[in-house]
UniProtKB/Swiss-Prot annotation:
Species of provenance: Vibrio vulnificus (strain CMCP6)
SUPFAM superfamilies, per the entry: FKBP-like, GreA transcript cleavage protein, N-terminal domain
Descriptive protein name: Transcription elongation factor GreB
GO MF terms, alphabetically ordered: DNA binding; RNA polymerase binding
Keywords attached to this entry: DNA-binding, Transcription, Transcription regulation
Keyword DNA damage: no
Taxonomic lineage of the native organism: Bacteria, Pseudomonadati, Pseudomonadota, Gammaproteobacteria, Vibrionales
Family: Belongs to the GreA/GreB family. GreB subfamily.
The UniProt record lists the keyword Protease: no
Domain of life per record: Bacteria
Length: 160
């Protein structure tokens, strides 16, 4: 089984999400389900149906997070990473057309909701960038062929 990795920032966000879902959101929705059920006929009760579905979604996410968080390996910055691309790096790349992209390489579970500026460690781009340095040229396989990118900068969040 592949080790599941996550940045400390990602772990903290998922932990906050679990706490919110379990301590605040789920009790609120449970109360709405109880209220809607008390109105009588559930077969045509839109409030009951909607909130019951929402409760199932919350429970599914809580089960996933409760199982995932204890199994995950938090990857913190290490001084040996400096100057090379590894898990957790913020990387700025540029192609010959002058297009610039900046993103952070993270675990796939960290990319959810409206998260922008993150790519999965499992993506072809991240795999091509790993262990490369600033000014290295990287060839990335894409459905339309090989694309070339140059690494402009590599940064790490060193705090926490």
């Amino acid at each position: 089984m592949k080790t599941k990795m996550i940045t400390r920032e990602g772990y903290n966000k998922l932990k906050q999400e679990l706490d919110y879902l379990w301590k605040e959101h789920r009790p609120e929705i449970t109360q709405k389900v109880s209220w809607a059920a008390s109105l009588g006929d559930r077969s045509e009760n839109a409030d009951y149906t909607y909130n019951k579905r929402l409760l199932r979604q919350i429970d599914r996410r809580v089960r996933f997070l409760s199982k995932f968080l204890p199994e995950v390996k938090i990857v913190d910055y290490a001084p040996q990473q400096e100057g090379k691309v590894f898990f957790g790096a913020w990387v700025e790349i540029e192609n010959e057309a002058g297009e610039v992209m900046k993103f952070r390489i993270v675990g796939p579970e960290e990319i959810y909701g409206d998260a922008k500026g993150y790519i999965s460690i499992d993506s072809p781009m991240a795999r091509a960038l790993l262990k490369k340095e600033v000014d290295d040229e990287v060839q990335v396989p894409t459905p339309s062929g090989i694309k070339e990118w140059f690494i402009n900068s590599i940064e790490y969040d060193k705090g926490e």
